Amino acid sequence: MIIDTTYLLPLARIGVDTDLLKDIAEKRVRIRFEDIAVNEISVFELQAKAAKLRIPPRHVVEAVEAIHKTFRVEPFHKPEIIEVSFKLRKTIQDYIDCIILATAITLKEDLITEDTLIIKNRQKIKENYRINILSYKEITE
């Protein structure tokens, strides 16, 4: 299972309405931390959002360490991820989202995201790549 950056933000004390990691810790969903992978680009994106919001660096360092300790972290520079991400640019404009989606596709793992464009194209993605796109709401129902 690949998770989008949104779900990592609470680790850096950035508030979101979709605290999936808290739900996992409290066993409100059937996902385990060891089943989750993220792309390294999500770690960068978390740092960038935290810097923009002026989150104290120590909280960001703690978040990054927790991510690397808890989840499988996939590099964004793998050739197959790059190739798939370039193909996805025809549909998804945000290149970081392309990388995250390409990670799910190349690993053949489902993606949990709140990205409206990815969710809008979920049927096409499922038909072409045989992975499911899920939202927080769908996971927690």
Predicted regions and their residues:
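Acidic, PIN/NYN-like endoribonuclease modules and their adjacent C-terminal/linker elements
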Residues: 70, 74, 105-141
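Residue-level signal for well-ordered alpha-helical positions
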Residues: 14-15, 49, 88, 124-125
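Short, well-structured N-terminal submotif of metal-dependent ribonuclease cores
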Residues: 1-38, 50-62, 140
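Acidic catalytic patch
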Residues: 37-41, 63-90
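Acidic, metal-associated active-site segment
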Residues: 94-110
